């Protein structure tokens, strides 16, 4: 039996049909909720990996019908999903406390995971600090069919090395980057975009692409001490792109005041 422990709130929503339940957090660029439900209800399991790999967006979801149950996280694991098996029962939850608080859960520490955490600050792969509880890694899903649980990788970051001419790689990177920002712009709509603009290449790229794609409603800001070079360059970049720029002065006294305030 599969037990799904999720507190429905502004983040997690339940989309229920006559044949299935879909618990979803996040959003999709590539499919509507109705399309996702229809496909997952009718798909042959041998094509499931390929379909999940076609999903685009930031999401985590659990789908359950009479044939199977799957729990999926996106390619960056923007939301976590944990799972645990006890005899013939399975428990899935985004909140590991829901699993740890089960009366029959034995809190046996995974010594390897403990060492990983002590050395790096986090566990590696699908490990948690507990022997019996696992957590999906980026690009993974777990499938339960006929009381059998199996974890799959639908996406891997490290693929075969591609040997292409430099100009081809540059063209491909340009296309991928522009396509991504077009999706972001479509999602944002008419809302204002606020960019923390520094002197670095990352934020400069973001601002430049929005300008290249004709986005007008953009506000850039920088912060720090009045004479810091990052803010000076940030202001020049914003002016060149035609975007409004705001400076937020920060000093030791303002930081100390904030850290001592009730807001912090």
Where on the chain are the PLM-derived regions?
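Short low-complexity, flexible loop/linker segments enriched in glycine and/or proline
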Residues: 234, 260-264
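Cysteine-centered catalytic environments shared across enzyme families
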Residues: 1-197, 201-256
